[in-house]
Every structure is written in C-alpha cells, then in structure tokens.
C-alpha cells in the first residue's frame, strides 16, 4: 500500500507531464536572463529534437512564450549548454558580428 502511495505522489510519477518536471526544476519561472515570468511557460529543447536533441532534462529549460517564440525561434536569442546550471544565453544575435550579450544564468560573461 505504501509503495503505491509513493509511486502516485512521487514528484517524478509517470503521470506527471514531462514539461512539469522541467518547470518544477526551474522554479516555475522563465530561465532567460533578467526574466522572471511565471506566465505562459513553455518547455524548450536546448538542442532541437529536429537536430537530434533528446528529451533528457539536461536538454530542456523553461522559457516564457515571448522568449521562446519571439527570441529563440525568431533567431534573436540562442541557448546552449546543459540545463539547469550550465546554460549560456546569447542575446541580440546578428548576421554580422558577435551577439550583443552573453549570459550564464544571470551573470553576464561577454
């Protein structure tokens, strides 16, 4: 009986949507530098699945809809590395020249 209860109420129970595991790990907040939005959260694959990326938690991060759709998928923001602690965000991507800023977490690195 206790085993069943532990399985059902475990934070990693199979019935919990995968995205919720990512959101929970990231504190239910957008992980883009300077953003703390808790609305319209989306599960982002750091290495896109279409490019061979996995569903592993280390390849996924939480982004708000704005940073996900108008940033990453619009080609203005790039995210690379292993989640949650080793993600590098490049902001202000341009056709010529380096990105305007690079962050690891909320720490600016370039």
Regions found by a protein language model. Give the residues of each.
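A boundary/linker detector
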Residues: 1-110
């Amino acid at each position: 009986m206790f085993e069943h209860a532990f399985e059902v109420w475990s934070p990693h129970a199979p019935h919990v949507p995968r995205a919720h595991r990512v959101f929970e790990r990231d504190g239910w907040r957008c992980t883009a530098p300077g953003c703390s939005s808790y609305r319209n959260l989306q599960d982002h694959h750091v290495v896109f699945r279409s490019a061979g990326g996995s569903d592993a938690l280390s390849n996924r991060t939480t982004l708000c809809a704005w940073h996900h759709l108008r940033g990453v998928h619009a080609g203005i923001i790039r995210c690379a590395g292993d989640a949650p602690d080793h993600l590098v965000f490049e902001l202000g991507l341009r056709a010529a020249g380096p990105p305007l800023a690079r962050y690891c977490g909320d720490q600016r690195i370039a």
